[in-house]
Amino acid sequence: MSLEYLPPVRRRIGQYNHLRIYKKILLLKSNFEKLNFFLGNLFPEELHDSKIHVYFEVRLGCRIPDCIIVFRHFGEKLLKTFHCYFFEFKTTFAKSNLFSIQKNRTQKIQYLQGLRQLRQATDYLQQFVIKNESLCKVNPVICFFRQHGLKLDFVKTFIAKELQLSSTFLCNLFTKYQNDTVKSILSISNPTNFRRACQKYSNLYRGRYATTPKLGNSKTSKRKRRNSKKQDFKKLVKN
């Protein structure tokens, strides 16, 4: 099942809104309550004091999850459990819910594609399992946001996988393979410049600030037209 039937501009708008979601997550990263609320209150309270690492569009084999959030526990000693959330974000023009996802063709395809992306991305981590390492709880999550106002309409969390993984290795892996262009865009602090960069990256940039090339000197064009009329008149007189 594919969304190829959608006009290209619809897909570009979706990409643009993904960048807006990423930026919002970064802005809320330091506030556990607000970040948790924005993403549907899916983080347990026990993660409140954990160190948060956020990565966007990390290439894991043939899959690129939209966002990965890692919670690492630090205290007098490193606890033997850490949490890793894999997110797939879907944006819609209309409101989405469980019923609309079942009945609406586009939303249903978005949901199924998200499931496949999450399953294959989390399966990719299996190759890095190390015996007697920390226990990593890998939580796949799919979120449907409304494009207007980035309102979260629907969120679904799936059964977590428990894998023995090195948190340090995993964070280094995600850092290495995340999208550097997206990371650069998200580092822009000025709202206007950030919006323009998002539009340009998504091919929605209208070139509002670009200079329009001149077609030619208007005086020269007028002179050519006058000379042409004179030549036509002379031909008529001769005939």
Curated annotation (Swiss-Prot):
UniProt main location, coarse: virion
GO cellular component: host cell Golgi apparatus; host cell nucleolus; virion component
Biased composition (Basic and acidic residues): 229-239
Cell compartment(s), UniProt: Virion; Host cytoplasm; Host nucleus, Host nucleolus; Host Golgi apparatus
Domain of life of the source: Viruses
UniProt entry keywords in alphabetical sequence: Host cytoplasm, Host Golgi apparatus, Host nucleus, Late protein, Virion
Family: Belongs to the herpesviridae UL24 family.
Function as written in the Swiss-Prot or TrEMBL entry: May participate in nuclear egress of viral particles. Plays a role in the dispersal of several host nucleolar proteins including NCL/nucleolin and NPM1. Since deletion of host NCL/nucleolin negatively impact on nuclear egress, UL24 supposedly acts on this process through its effect on host nucleoli.
Name of protein: Protein UL24 homolog
Higher taxonomy: Viruses, Duplodnaviria, Heunggongvirae, Peploviricota, Herviviricetes
Gene symbol of the encoding locus: U49
